[in-house]
């Protein structure tokens, strides 16, 4: 028996061919036909089984992919919702922080405005007080000058009328003048103490108002200190003017006293 190239030889196939050879050509053909039919049937069954297995694996793969896609979509939705919630939370925190910052800024501006208004009012009051004091001192000086002129005239008339009476009147006038001078000096010292106390209180209030400010208020502090320096300079100038006026008054009193003494000497002689 000959074997075709490319086919494997098996004892079963050899025994089958031996039986077919002994049975005759017709039986051989039938047997071969049956074997081919059986082989074809087996191939078809195997093909169907493979298709079913592949279909089952494909279905399982499709279901796994579908589950994975659904899980991925659910995870994406969950993360999107989480991101939205987180973004909403952060936006709310940012808004709250902005509102708190705005409220603190408004409160700071209001407190600063109140401090500035209070300082401005105090400065205006101090300027008004200085002006009133200057007017009062001018009136007092004019009144004192008028009184001195009247007293001088009275003394001159008294000298013309009667020598003894004039001496007595001059002594009384000198006594009154000394009392007036002491009174004026006491008033000047008292007013100086009051103004120094008010200036010290104003300086304390300014330092207290400017003590708790941040760096952004440094310019305002410097400006306020400059104004206070200018005010102190003005007060110092006013004090010097007042001292000069007091010196003029004292000089006038000394001149008047000297004139009275000279007049008394002339009368005595």
Swiss-Prot record:
GO molecular function terms here? Answer: structural constituent of cytoskeleton
Please give the chief subcellular localization of this protein: cytoplasm
- Record's GO cellular component terms: cytoplasm; microtubule
Tell me which InterPro entries the record gives.
SF_assemblin/giardin_b
Q: Does the keyword Transferase apply?
A: no
Q: Where is region (Nonhelical region) located?
A: 1-24
- Extract the ranges annotated as region (Disordered): 1-23
Q: Which residues form a coiled coil?
A: 98-144
Q: What keywords were assigned to this record?
A: Coiled coil, Cytoplasm, Cytoskeleton, Microtubule
Q: Where in the cell is it found?
A: Cytoplasm, Cytoskeleton
Q: Name one Pfam family in it.
A: SF-assemblin
Q: Where is this region: Rod?
A: 25-269
Cross-referenced PANTHER family: SF-ASSEMBLIN (PTHR40412:SF1)
Entry note about domains: Consists of a small non-helical N-terminal domain and a rod domain with a 29 residue repeat pattern based on four heptads followed by a skip residue. This alpha-helical protein is characterized by the ability to form a special segmented coiled coil and to assemble into striated fibers of 2 nm protofilaments.
Question: What does this protein do, in the record's words?
Answer: Major component of the striated microtubule-associated fibers (SMAFs; system-I-fibers).
The UniProt entry's sequence similarity note says:
Belongs to the SF-assemblin family.
Q: Please give the name of this protein.
A: SF-assemblin
């Amino acid at each position: 028996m000959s074997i075709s190239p490319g086919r494997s030889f098996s004892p079963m196939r050899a025994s089958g061919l031996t039986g077919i050879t002994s049975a005759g050509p017709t039986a051989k053909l039938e047997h071969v036909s049956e074997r081919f039919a059986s082989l074809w049937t087996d191939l078809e069954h195997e093909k169907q089984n493979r298709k079913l297995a592949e279909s089952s694996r494909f279905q399982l793969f499709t279901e796994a992919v579908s589950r994975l896609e659904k899980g991925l979509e659910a995870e994406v939705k969950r993360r999107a919702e989480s991101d939205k919630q987180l973004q909403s939370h952060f936006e709310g925190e940012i808004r709250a922080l902005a509102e708190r910052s705005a409220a603190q800024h408004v409160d700071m501006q209001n407190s600063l405005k109140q401090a500035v208004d209070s300082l401005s009012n105090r400065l205006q009051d101090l300027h008004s007080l200085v002006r009133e004091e200057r007017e009062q001192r001018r009136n007092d000086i004019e009144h004192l000058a008028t009184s001195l002129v009247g007293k001088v005239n009275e003394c001159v008339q008294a000298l013309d009328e009667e020598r003894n009476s004039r001496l007595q009147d001059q002594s009384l006038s000198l006594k009154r003048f000394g009392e007036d001078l002491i009174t004026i000096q006491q008033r000047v010292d008292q007013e100086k103490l009051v103004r120094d106390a008010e200036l010290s209180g104003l300086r304390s209030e300014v330092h207290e108002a400017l003590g708790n400010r941040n760096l952004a208020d440094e310019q305002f502090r410097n400006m306020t200190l400059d104004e206070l320096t200018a005010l102190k300079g003005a007060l110092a100038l006013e004090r010097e003017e007042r001292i000069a006026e007091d010196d003029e008054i004292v000089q006038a009193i000394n001149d008047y006293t000297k004139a009275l003494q000279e007049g008394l000497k002339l009368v005595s002689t």
